[in-house]
C-alpha cells in the first residue's frame, strides 16, 4: 500500500523505534496490521491516535511533543502517507540535515510541467543545497502555473525536515495557542483549530528554506493522480488486484 511504502521509506532513514505514525483513531488497527505485515510490529507508544482530524499542524505538533520527550535535540522528518517518491530522494533528503538544524526545511519538486493541483514555492537566495523561501503560492490556474514553471518555482511536496527545537520555537512564536495546548499533560485535541502546517507556520515563519528534489514524485491523494502514473491496458483502464482475477 502507499502507507506501507511510506513506512519503508522512513525505515531506510531511521530505526523503527524512532518512527512515529500519526493517524485517526478509527484507522489505528489498519495501521498496526499494515506495519506488522512488513515485519516491523509497531509499539503502542509509537502510534499517535487523533480523536478528530485537525489538519497537519496539530498532527505534526503532536508528534513533535512526543519526540521532544525522548530527544530534545532530534531532527523530525515528516512524510505524508499518500506520496510516491523515488528511492534516489533519500540522499537528497540527507543533504538537508545541516540546514534543518536552524531552519524549517520544505522539500520542493522540480516541476515536470504546469500543474494546477499543487502549491508552488518561489526560491530566493541560495543557501547550502537549497534556497531561502521567498514566497509560497496557492494552487494556480494553468496559465499562472506555466508562468511559475518558467520562473523556476518548485512544487510544494508537503515533506518537511526540522529540529524539534526550531519547530517548537516557531510554533510558540506564530501559533501560541496550539503550542500552549501541547504543553498540557493531556492536550484537549478536539479544541484545537484545523490548520495546515503550510498556512499556520511555514508561510509566516522567516526561518524557512526549500531543498529541491530531483527524484520522481507524485502526490497520489486523488484517483486522477493515481491514474496518471498507473500501468494501463489497451483500453486505457487501470486495475489493481489483490488476489485471483
What are these regions (language model features)?
Residues 1-78, 84-90, 94:
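Conserved N-terminal catalytic core of the sugar/cofactor nucleotidyltransferase
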Residues 3, 63, 82, 121, ...:
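Residue-level signal for inorganic ion chemistry
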Residues 19-20, 46, 75-77, 103-106, ...:
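Structural motif
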Residues 23, 79, 140, 162, ...:
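A conserved hydrophobic position in a structured secondary element of the catalytic/binding core
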Residues 24, 81, 109, 213:
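Cofactor-binding loop segments of dinucleotide-utilizing enzymes, especially the Rossmann-like FAD-
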Residues 53-58, 113-115, 142-143, 217-218:
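A short acidic, often aromatic-flanked loop/helix-cap motif at beta-alpha or helix-coil junctions
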Residues 86-180, 186-189, 209:
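Conserved core of the sugar-phosphate nucleotidyltransferase
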Residues 162-245:
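Left-handed beta-helix
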Amino acid at each position: 500500500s502507499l502507507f506501507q511504502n511510506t513506512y519503508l521509506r522512513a525505515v531506510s532513514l531511521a530505526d523503527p523505534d524512532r518512527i512515529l505514525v500519526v493517524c485517526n483513531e478509527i484507522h489505528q488497527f489498519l495501521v498496526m496490521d499494515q506495519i506488522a505485515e512488513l515485519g516491523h510490529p509497531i509499539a503502542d507508544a509509537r502510534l499517535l491516535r487523533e480523536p478528530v482530524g485537525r489538519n497537519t499542524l496539530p498532527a505534526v505538533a503532536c508528534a513533535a511533543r512526543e519526540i521532544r520527550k525522548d530527544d530534545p535535540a532530534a531532527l523530525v522528518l515528516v512524510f505524508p502517507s499518500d506520496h510516491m517518491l523515488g528511492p534516489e530522494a533519500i540522499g537528497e533528503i540527507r543533504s538537508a540535515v545541516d540546514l534543518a538544524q536552524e531552519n524549517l526545511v520544505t522539500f520542493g519538486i522540480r516541476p515536470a510541467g504546469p500543474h494546477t493541483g499543487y502549491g508552488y514555492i518561489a526560491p530566493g537566495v541560495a543557501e547550502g543545497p537549497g534556497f531561502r523561501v521567498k514566497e509560497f503560492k496557492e494552487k494556480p490556474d494553468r496559465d499562472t502555473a506555466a508562468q511559475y514553471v518558467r520562473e523556476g518555482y518548485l512544487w510544494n511536496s508537503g515533506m518537511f525536515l526540522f529540529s524539534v527545537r526550531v519547530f517548537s520555537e516557531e510554533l510558540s512564536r506564530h501559533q501560541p495557542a496550539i503550542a500552549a495546548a501541547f504543553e498540557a499533560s493531556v492536550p484537549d485535541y478536539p479544541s484545537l483549530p484545523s490548520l495546515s502546517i503550510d498556512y499556520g507556520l511555514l508561510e509566516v515563519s522567516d526561518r524557512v528554506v526549500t531543498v529541491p528534489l530531483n527524484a520522481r514524485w507524485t502526490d497520489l491523494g486523488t484517483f486522477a493522480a493515481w491514474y496518471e502514473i498507473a500501468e494501463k491496458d489497451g483500453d486505457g483502464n487501470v486495475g489493481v488486484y489483490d488476489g485471483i482475477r
